[in-house]
Amino acid sequence: MKNCKVCIVTGASRGLGRGIALVLARDEGCRVYATARNGDALKALVEEAATGTRGGTVNACVLDQSDDAAVQAFVEQVRTKESQVNLLVNSAYAGLIAIKPHFGKPFWERPLSVFDASLNIGLRSAYVMSALVAPLMVKNKAGLIVQISSFGGVNYLFDVGYGVGKAGLDRLTADMAAELNPYDVHAVTLYPGGAVTEIAAFPGGETPVFTGRAVAALLNKATKEDLARMNGKVAQTAELAVNYGFTDVSGDMPKGPFAGVDAAKQCREAMSKPLIQYDMDAELPDASATNNPDIAAMFPGA
């Protein structure tokens, strides 16, 4: 399809990235360049996306995002094939696999590599990909960049490096939006709820398809006015589901303690308050609530 929208989705071999790429191609008819290191997993994604009837496709692109030269070569390949990129979704993240063996330990008892895992393939990789894709969007004065982040950007969650990485993504979006705004290119941070993926098993959590439908809503249902309001800001999957009328694969909304409308409301309330580092009267969170050995059970695939 010549007129279909062109999307790049990183971290697409599994988890939320896979669900996002699948929905965009299979259900929305987009041409998706899906990146990951696992070529076999990408091949399976290509085959599943081909079952759709909208004419969308997934192009499997084996890519190590720690290799800047390889990322640049990938973007150049896309640039030679496409006149535009409508959407970039930065979903690649390597932190949870590194964090899992160390639940219950403070940061000074964890290997330094745990911190690097959260920031290198996550925050830094999102910056690199965005910096390389943005010129094409700026040239066309159109485009949307979505960073997949989490509530860890607002409050303590799991690990020091996890929170620093997610807070960094949120600020990355805000500052990029400020520089992109004159060119009608938008940047939005997306908070999924607790999810059920190959790695995570949050009770009552949302599926990767639900996250994919949230991204699709930003791409195809949000108006220019909607995107202008969300530009540089944090949107939540459950909020988008209410606003744009979609559900999870079950036909219902996720209803777990970490996902769904109620969880999103609690998160929004937390976001409305000053961050603890700026509020001298704020109480520090109890780190042990989400950094304990029992939490590791929520990540059986890590």
Residue spans for each PLM region:
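Conserved glycine-rich cofactor-binding loop
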Residues: S13-G15
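Active-site loop of short-chain dehydrogenase/reductase
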Residues: C4-K5, G55, S83-V85, M137-S150, ...
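C-terminal helical subdomain
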Residues: T189-L190, A201-P300
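A short, exposed helix-loop element centered on a Lys and neighboring polar residues
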Residues: S130-A131, A174
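Conserved glycine-rich Rossmann-like NAD(P)H-binding loop of the short-chain dehydrogenase/reductase
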Residues: E28-L45
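Catalytic loop of short-chain dehydrogenase/reductase
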Residues: A94-G95, P106-V114, S118, L144-P182, ...
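Rossmann-fold cofactor-recognition segment
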Residues: A49-D68
